[in-house]
Amino acid sequence: SYDCRVLIANSTAACVRDEFVLIELDRVRVKGKVEPETIFTLIGDRASKQDRALHEFDEVFQEMRRHYVSRRWADAFKATERLRIPAEKYGLTGVIDVYQARIDQLRSGGVESDWDGVFNWETK
């Protein structure tokens, strides 16, 4: 569980992105589906678009995700540590917990050679 206030799919994000600040959280494959879905959290209203700290948070978060998808586990984990305190401000500590747990699991258990960086949800 990402434990964030609002979680939306790409189709909803496309409808609201001009009115709200969104952070792209993850790419997931829902149980029973083949194609991955990008999921977002709604983090603030239009006025929040001027929040420099929020932009910086998102930049580091997306950097962490690039490291994660590229299997650079140490760099990804370091980025989650940098995100921990600002994540509290935005109600996203659960998201950081999810990524830290995944990174620990993936670097200790390895990943398949064809892993595409998409998390497979095993339950609906």
Residue ranges and their predicted role:
Residues S1-D75, T80-V95, Y99-S108, E112:
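Cytosolic regulatory/linker segments at or just downstream of nucleotide-handling modules
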